[in-house]
């Protein structure tokens, strides 16, 4: 299982894939535009068993979270402050 953490900002999203042991296996920055979701999903296809943790899914990450849920991905919201 891979956990894909996403730090969304107004103009870009940074995604980091972490394995079950907590090791970073990949990292990618996506510029936010009309093709962002498609590129993000293409990158994630290499991990068929995955979950998403989106920082601030009710803020800048809202659109991404909604699109992921719409295609039946497992998504959790992560608070932007501890």
Label for each model-derived stretch:
Residues 1-82:
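Phosphate- and other anionic-substrate recognition elements at nucleic-acid/protein interfaces
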């Amino acid at each position: 299982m891979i956990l894909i953490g996403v730090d969304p900002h107004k103009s870009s999203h940074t995604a980091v894939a972490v394995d079950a042991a907590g090791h970073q296996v990949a990292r990618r920055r996506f510029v936010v535009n009309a093709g962002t979701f498609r590129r993000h999903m293409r990158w994630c296809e290499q991990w068929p068993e995955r979950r998403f943790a989106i920082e601030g899914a009710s803020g800048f990450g809202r659109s991404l979270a909604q699109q992921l849920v719409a295609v039946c991905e497992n998504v959790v919201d992560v608070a932007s402050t501890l």
